[in-house]
Amino acid sequence: MTIDRRRFLATLGASAAALATRGAAVGAGPLPRGKKVDRIGIQLYTLRKRASTDLPGVLAELSRIGYKEVEFAGYYKHPATEIREMLKQHGLTAPSAHVAIDLIETQSAQVFEDARIIGHEWITVPSLPRGRATTAEDWQRIAAQFNRVATHVKSAGFRFAFHNHNDIVRTAGDVLPIDILMRETDPVLVAFQMDIYWAVNGGADPLELLARYPGRFKMLHVKDGQRPPGDVQTDVGAGTIDFKSIFARAKGIEHYFVESDSPADPMAFAAASYKYLSHLDF
């Protein structure tokens, strides 16, 4: 919900007048509040151990917590038709799936068929194989690969995105890989899913990235933790990342997926993180 500035100022003035004349605005309605995340999602990698043996139970519990969206990273040996029915049963949607780029290139027919059945909009590359990109020239080749694969993804009726880790905001030679990717990929074809924690962990400022590349980030991985040099992840809202400021400046974000790589109690993490985000105004 977007605040109407004129209505906000009028309400603020009326409330101030009431306080001045009566000492308290007895019975007055609350001031308009900021935006909230309408449909909070979660990356199922967070709960991968339990999901591998009880995906229906995981989806049921996430739905009870309040989640509306999930992002897959594999289907835990369930056929796409079963996944679709599980999601429908629990009032969930799965707008995105993490799929390895090599799998998209070598098994695209199956990838696209599963995505079509389940209802994915986004085919998101979660990372690159270790060691594949270490130099500026490597990243240029990756950018060309992204353009090529994204063209194929679009032709099948889906959208292509890349999820960052900390490597793309660390210098390769004298340049940042993210600058190469942004410069050399087609903005119509290639979008980005910012993992906020990994951006910070790599030394980047999410606000600066959003300002430098407006419109390129379409999804966020909402992950919290301590500042570098440590690599300690926390419940969302319990770390040091200022999500309120980031969300307020993140224009054009379509999906917000909570994630933690290895929480001690994944479902407790999911519940605590949902509670924080559901109360966050920005």
Regions found by a protein language model. Give the residues of each.
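N-terminal secretory signal peptides and thylakoid transit peptides that target proteins
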Residues: 1-16
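Active-site acidic/histidine proton-transfer and metal-coordination neighborhood
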Residues: 12, 69, 76, 93, ...
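C-terminal segment of N-terminal export signals and the immediately downstream linker at the start
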Residues: 23-52, 61
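Conserved, mostly hydrophobic/aromatic
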Residues: 42, 62, 70, 87, ...
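Active-site mouth loops of central-metabolism enzymes
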Residues: 43-53, 98-104, 136
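Short, acidic/polar
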Residues: 50-61, 105-114, 204-209
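Catalytic domains of carbohydrate-active enzymes, especially glycoside hydrolases
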Residues: 58-76
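Gly/Pro-rich active-site loop or hairpin
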Residues: 59-60, 68, 169-175, 198-255, ...
